[in-house]
Amino acid sequence: MRQNIILECVETGERLYLTSKNKRNNPERIELKKYSPKLRRRAIFKEVK
């Protein structure tokens, strides 16, 4: 079963991206590199609970 999640930038704290993940295959929190307009570069975004 897929669940929608919000990704928050570690450096700026902004919540920009919505995505989904399969809880059964990935029970731990997701960490992705995405583009941050404030920083004007790619940054690490972590899953918000």
Swiss-Prot record:
Keyword Ribosomal protein belongs to the record: yes
Domain of life: Bacteria
One GO term (biological process): translation
Pfam families, per the entry: Ribosomal_L33 (PF00471)
GO MF, one annotated term: structural constituent of ribosome
GO CC list: cytoplasm; ribonucleoprotein complex; ribosome
Transmembrane segments: none
Keywords: Ribonucleoprotein, Ribosomal protein
Coiled coil: none
NCBIfam families in alphabetical order: PRK00504.1, PRK00595.1, rpmG_bact
Entry similarity comment: Belongs to the bacterial ribosomal protein bL33 family.
Protein name: Large ribosomal subunit protein bL33A
Source organism per UniProt: Enterococcus faecalis (strain ATCC 700802 / V583)
